[in-house]
Amino acid sequence: MTATPSRSLSYPFSHGVCLALFASLLLAGCASWNPWKQREKSARDQEKYGYTADTRIKKLSERSKVVKSESTQSQIEFTQDLVRMMLEEHDPRVRSKILETAAEYDTSAATAICTGALQDPDEMVRIRACDVWGKRGGDDAVQLLATRFQTDAELDVRLRALKMLGELKDKQAIPVLARALEDSDPAVQYRAVASLKKVSGRDLGNDVNVWREWAADPEGKKAEWSIAEGFRQLF
């Protein structure tokens, strides 16, 4: 009969020891973490370095929502502030957000940001700028995207510029896309083909040589191209 009390006493004792050991390990592992000290450090860092990138992005979104419902003059002043922010911002994620925000406004300052972002030192921002101009359109869009394709050192940026030229569906882009067919990189050639399909409204397949022939005389041989496209749709 003595065995039962022994077991009932040993269980809570061992359980209590385990909890004590776990607590001591937990406290030892978290000795360097103190929520109050962390808050104080965050406050000091914010005072010294400013808001974190995520906070700056959040505040920018909140401010833009308010400004959209305000007067034209308020929007002009806001986008002028965005120019200053763009020039001072060191984080490319935040610059991308500034760019996307500016693209929602029709002011000279907003246009300046969208144009300047095409030459941003960060590849990600330049790609976003191509997206912006693909949606923004306008008289300058083809030339700006063409220049980015022809001059950028990064393949991903060049490919995005070609893609956005297709999204514009502007026939002024055909000469640029035709030159892209001569690029030594197959990825560039096939991106040019995809964009030519959108700009021309035709589907001549994926043969680069066929598109080269078409691009040499887009307005000629209309009947022949139409017949070829008809067979392609059937088969």
Regions found by a protein language model. Give the residues of each.
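Amphipathic alpha-helical scaffolding segments comprising HEAT/armadillo-like alpha-solenoid repeats
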Residues: 33-47, 69-87, 107-119, 138-151, ...
